[in-house]
């Protein structure tokens, strides 16, 4: 009886595990472009915007079934590494390098207007985040803003929905360490916070991988080292995600070693005082993007595949071997991904 009972429970466990694994699947969608994609925004269940190289921006209004592609006039040689959209009509795209630009459309991409331009040695924008439809922030690589040989992380802000952008006060532009920079891998290394002490945070890489938390008015800012791989130009934290419980998730690695899974993921629940890193099953390689699907359920992607964690952030499962640069989650918990050669996919996890 005892052996039979054990075998019965073992059979149930194996069947349950296999069935659970079958629920993870990435379905590729036909996009109609061959452009590298790194930016994505999902303002509703049906509306998806993506952005990429050669001035390319794409939009779907039917949940990814069909796509309309736009080459923004005058920006044919620019990389749009990030995009933020509010609906099917309004979107803001970020063109990264010197000179850096922001462009905005309010008619679904038919026309675009330049809302920001900045030329400066070393200028390179990396990521945006919006708190709501009015207030947004953008961060770039460290530059010598005032000609005093101090490399400060370049930060600009908008309070009118991206119509105008202004440089943040210099005391809100932290100084970078030698060899420290920000990666423009997926537009996800800066985020507004719900923390009462800190307004927003961003993550860095290179010779140092740090988490910077900028204090709210009257509060002190804070910088802490992350436990992620660092020390070379190609290493560090490439993406971050935050939840309402003040947890900050960091992911990255070494983009020159796409299959390397050592020191590529960690999270903190107390503003960096203590970090938790999985010792048994970390993400399966360098990852360029991490997003929260729902409470303690995460998705991450990179050149060697898509990973999924549903058990308190500590154990990751392989969802797909398909390569993607960026993943985003809709309000209805749909997960879409985009990557090289126009690849777009949707993750099924239920």
Residue ranges of predicted features:
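Bacterial Sec-dependent N-terminal signal peptides
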Residues: 1-25
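Residue-level hotspots at or immediately adjacent to binding/recognition sites across diverse folds
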Residues: 21-350
